Amino acid sequence: MIPYSAPIQDMRFVLNEVVGMDRITSLPGYADATPDMVDAILDEAGKLASNVLAPINFSGDQEGAVLENGVVRTPKGFREAYRQYQEGGWNSVPFDPEHGGQGLPWTLAMAVQEMWQAANMSFALCPMLNQGAVEALTEHGSDALKEIYLGKLISGEWTGTMNLTEPQAGSDLAAIRTRAVREDGHYRISGQKIYITYGEHDFTENIIHMVLARLNDAPPGIKGISLFVVPKFLVNPDGSLGERNDLRCVSLEHKLGIHASPTAVMAFGDNDGAIGYLVGEENRGIEYMFTMMNNARMGVGLQGVAISERAYQQARDYARTRVQSRDMTDAKGEPVSIVRHPDVRRMLMTMRAQTEAARALTYYAVAALDVAKKHADPAEAAKGQAMADLLTPVVKAWCTDLGVENASTGIQIHGGMGFIEETGAAQHLRDARITPIYEGTNGIQANDLVFRKVIRDGGAAAGNLFAEMRETVEALKHLPGDDMAAISIALGKAVDALEKATAWLVEHGKRMPQAAAAGAANYLRMFGITTGGFLMARAAMAALQGQADPDADQRFLDAKLITARFFADQFLPQAASLLTPITEGHRTVMALSEDQF
């Protein structure tokens, strides 16, 4: 077994000192989320993650999910783990109490979900996708649909899926061919969907598919797509399960990673057509789908944080115990643990700093979503929504890029043993590699950030964030110590570069869309580095203040300061280096003709 210990102390620090959990719990409806309750939830979630989910992660990867006679069997221990997860009420943490949820902040729920994802990413994909289905039904479903489906989806008695992709319609959902035909009181759905996470499994007795399909008289393109609830088993008026719907799992994909997560090819309507129920209004499916998609994108970004943490813990433990070569300062001494060697330290510090920055960014973005959902002042709620919208593509793309990078670095620290499957380090990289691809590729996230989140509002939402960054730069100048001064200078230079890049995009992006798109990935990376550095700076300020308390954990706070300084020294300077590729790189990106490739 490869152990996982939930980093609860760091999670609490980020929630309380960087995000400001008291600000979130003071919002209407969140009064029950007292500090004692938050601590208890984190502790209990950590136990489930470490003791139940983590022990079956490696074996689940080796065994994988299998399809036998139309039935998907998840690996040994997964079904029992889901039973413990569901009976513990973990699925209901952030959802509306009116339908059986606990009504706790999304910020807390994301911290809890980080533990699931780090302990066992394949397992955690099931509740993550279910969460998106719940959100879509909550926001857009009729009262009748909510009455039938929401309670059991929230409790985890049933699970939900997202059925978007088709063989010819990947990122371009306008190419969807799945059809919906009106029938008395419902619709008949026919078509094939691919890459459906947990499209079939043995966790629950019913699976509720959220399916994008097109009516025969619908307008062309994305404006003619509708969203439907298509249950595996139809539901009788009394809530009991009726007959099997006309849908089936055709096959499971054989994948690079997340082997224990069944990725299904689903066929709808082989016979008379699967019965489906319209969500909201006809031809507004793409709009509703983005409720699911944005939730999933935040969740996938969290996977990047989680896999970084898991890979870091394993690499750290290996470096402490692997003895190889003498210490550079003691040529005649005995061989030492490789954690003593500077390059191994550099790699471990890189993994640690990037993971902490990504965690802070994700929690900060989700906290903005809580403000959007709950703030009593509509203007403040709108600001929260704008901030969450701005940061969602950054969370999804930057954090998953870091997840892949950190998992690869973890293998490097293991040396040759990292390339051997039984070590377990390779699994983290194989699992992580899908995260920059699904729920919208990171290239799509970069375009979303540039064109929809920055250019569309003239940089207004970004400007609000930059103002917060500037306040932190100034505050650091008035704090004692070389570390605070160095972080202030590094952050200030990064913000300068980010503001210049943003101004260039706002000025030229509409007139030169190809140029803006050519620099979009670099802009998103700059945005992630700078925002991560801003939040690491806030962490450093809080750690410095905390050191005044003689009862505080001084070693933990000292590590926070050192890690923040490392991020400022090693990563914030990269932001300025990306300015020229953003503003000038298009000249060569698009220079070759197609036949020159």
Q: Residue spans of the language-model regions?
A:
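Internal maturation/activation junctions in enzymes
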Residues: 65, 78, 129-130, 141-178, ...
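Amphipathic, small/basic residue-rich leader segments at the start of a protein or domain
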Residues: 1-124, 148, 370, 580-581, ...
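Alpha-helix capping/hinge segments and adjacent helical runs
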Residues: 2-5, 182, 258, 364, ...
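A glycine-rich, basic-preceded beta-loop-alpha segment at the flavin cofactor/substrate interface
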Residues: 195-197, 234-250, 255, 262-296, ...
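C-terminal amphipathic alpha-helical interaction region
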Residues: 99, 456, 472-597
